[in-house]
């Protein structure tokens, strides 16, 4: 066992710079490629296909999206390609400043009858929605958004794409890897472990790797929380109507999650909290801000706009 382990350690030591550069390039390239080439990938994943055919974007949704772009003041040279998605929330990817542009998936439920029709079967997590039940009626009501709430949901995606924060997220992993490697090598030299026993060096490297992952997880979650909070505040600041739509959007989102919690039974209790937030999948991490926190933030902004003297 010592032979292969020594050979592996010697190989890593001999090619450590190349391995580091290759690993950093891979950690940056894989997530960023999703946004550099969004047109075929995102539409293939999220396109709404009623009756086996991709649904074209209806004129009313196209008009709604163009209105959002005008409200935000997006330059005419930025490229956006909206399409109809089967999801209940908008999806987006890409860089609007680049030639490939950005894509934004607009939920078919924004039209109302396409998905919310009680004669149209909907399966969620393996459970067919019973629209006649109280929870089914609540879910149906949560999918019916006002024009202001729809505009808030779309504007939030456009603001995110215009900010190019995707590149910052993609840079975080390689930056943490390079930082962990540099600090680990420096600590080995400082403590005199570089020429010490291999077992001791391996143990130190393992501790450094764990510390690096913890730093990455904390940085990733903190950045995500900051971006989500900024997106809500930036979108709500467009006007009082957008802020009001944001409050409705998150209220309907929480109401829909509570309906799903009831419809899915025990599976729903594992997915959603009694307040409608998503149950964290990791014990020591909260990857996203709770929806209640985001709703309260937008609600506070809306109240401040209605009563500027009290803000």
UniProtKB/Swiss-Prot annotation:
Listed transmembrane segments: 18-38, 167-187, 198-218
Taxonomy, superkingdom: Eukaryota
Residue numbers on the Mitochondrial matrix membrane side: 1-17, 188-197
Membrane topology: Multi-pass membrane protein
Cellular compartments annotated: Mitochondrion inner membrane
Keyword Mitochondrion attributed: yes
Keywords annotated in UniProt: Membrane, Mitochondrion, Mitochondrion inner membrane, Transmembrane, Transmembrane helix
Major subcellular location class: mitochondrion
UniProt key word Chaperone: no
Function of the molecule: Plays a role in the early steps of cytochrome c oxidase subunit II (MT-CO2/COX2) maturation and is required for the stabilization of COX20 and the newly synthesized MT-CO2/COX2 protein.
Family: Belongs to the TMEM177 family.
Record text on subunit structure and interactions: Found in a complex with COX20, COA6, MT-CO2/COX2, COX18, SCO1 and SCO2. Interacts with COX20. Interacts with COX1, MT-CO2/COX2, SCO1 and SCO2 in a COX20-dependent manner.
Name under which the protein is recorded: Transmembrane protein 177
Organism ancestry: Eukaryota, Metazoa, Chordata, Craniata, Vertebrata
């Amino acid at each position: 066992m010592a032979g292969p382990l020594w050979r592996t350690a010697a190989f890593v030591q001999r090619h450590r710079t190349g391995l580091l550069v290759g690993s950093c390039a891979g950690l940056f390239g894989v997530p960023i490629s999703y946004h550099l080439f969004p047109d075929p990938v995102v539409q293939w994943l999220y396109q709404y296909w009623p009756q086996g055919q991709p649904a074209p974007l209806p004129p009313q949704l196209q008009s709604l999206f163009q209105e959002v772009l005008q409200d935000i003041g997006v330059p005419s040279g930025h490229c956006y390609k909206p399409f109809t998605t089967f999801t209940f929330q908008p999806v987006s990817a890409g860089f609007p400043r680049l030639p490939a542009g950005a894509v934004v998936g607009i939920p078919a439920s924004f039209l109302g009858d396409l998905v919310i029709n009680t004669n149209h079967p909907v399966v969620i997590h393996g459970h067919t929605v019973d629209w006649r039940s109280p929870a089914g009626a609540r879910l149906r009501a949560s999918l019916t958004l006002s024009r202001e709430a729809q505009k808030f949901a779309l504007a939030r995606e456009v603001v995110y794409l215009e900010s190019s924060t995707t590149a910052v997220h993609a840079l975080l992993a390689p930056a943490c890897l390079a930082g962990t490697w540099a600090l680990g090598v420096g600590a080995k030299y400082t403590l005199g472990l570089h020429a010490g026993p291999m077992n001791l060096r391996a143990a130190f490297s393992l501790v450094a790797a764990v510390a690096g992952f913890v730093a990455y997880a904390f940085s990733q979650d903190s950045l995500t929380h900051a971006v989500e909070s900024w997106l809500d505040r930036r979108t709500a600041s467009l006007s009082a109507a957008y802020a009001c739509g944001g409050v409705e959007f998150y209220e309907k989102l929480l109401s829909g999650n509570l309906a799903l919690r009831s419809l899915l039974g025990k599976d729903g209790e594992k997915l959603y909290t009694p307040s409608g937030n998503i149950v964290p999948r990791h014990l020591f991490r909260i990857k996203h801000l709770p929806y209640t926190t985001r709703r309260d933030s937008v609600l506070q902004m809306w109240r401040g706009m209605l009563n500027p003297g009290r803000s």
